[in-house]
Amino acid sequence: MLTRRAVLSCAPLAIAGSVKAGPRASVESISVISRQPEFYHGWPTLAQDQQGGLLVAYSGGREAHICPFGRVEIIRSSDGGRNWSWPQVILDSPIDDRDAGICITPAGSLLVTTFTSLAYRTVFAHANDWPAERLARWRSADERTSPKQRAYLLDTWMLRSTDGGMTWSSPFRVPLNSPHGPVVLSDGRLLYAGKQLWTSTKKVGVCDSRDDGKTWNWLGSIPVRPSDNVAEYHELHAVETLHGRIVVHIRNHNALNPGETLQSESDDGGKSWTVPHPIGVWGLPSQLLRLRDGRLLMSYGYRRAPFGNQARVSSDGGKTWSEPLLISSDGAGGDLGYPSTVQLADGKLITVWYESMKDMPHAVLRKAQWSIVG
């Protein structure tokens, strides 16, 4: 659990022949959109509502990458990303609330996903040299819950709003988790690709919902490569191609293709899946988007020099991917990424990610506006 987001060691590209030359990114602007520099912000997801408004869900209120203070927040923009609201806290459990995904259903409901973690307790157990005030702060946060209460709170969660996010349901348990949450399929179903986190099996696969996100049912498991440990598959995301194939990307930490994105496909609506295979892309995790012209876009963090965020385009439904398009390359280190992209009505792209910047005390949310040339 603690190594899931460790800065990754260098690894050579695999299956280089599957990567072909293609378009480039024309980046118009990059800006910081979070407004509370006293807090660490992490692992956002960007969504666009039916009126064109933008919403970002993320883990906010934090002290560090791992801490007991994480909560789920949302910020909004009604002008294409130029200005952003003050954060709305929608979940603040007594333990760490982490990566936040967001999906807007065909009915207009908002679904936000997250998971809780006790990883901060391992950090705290080795914090003997901390200042007394920080030790007391973490201890008091931890003592809000008993061991039994912590065990109850440790799970994968979803919240639902049917009034545009003014009010939210209580969090309810879902069978799996991934950073960027569910997607909408052409048949109206909601599909959630992810991983079981706090179970003994660590199964990866997809669930679907046919009732606007109220309930979720396990649909299909993704097989494991013969040499792989399923526990080293992480942070899945899905997209549906124009022809109905579903493509899923997987963050891989196995010895074969370490630090690369693996891909699996389904041609029967998510019931069965191909064995994951490398696509020649180092960097993760990947968020997938189908562009209006039918091409697929993958956005992913790049945690080695040049530190930043990249994207690639597929013109053939995920069979091959272009060379990288640089969204940002000015990062100070590896604590960045989880980019999430939407396409505006004018065809331009907005990508949001988190990043620890050298001139900021804590990680912030950054936004790029850009276009694909070619």
What function would you assign to each model-found segment?
Residues 1-12:
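N-terminal secretory signal peptides and thylakoid transit peptides that target proteins
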Residues 22-374:
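Asp-box/BNR beta-propeller blade signature and adjacent active/binding-site loops
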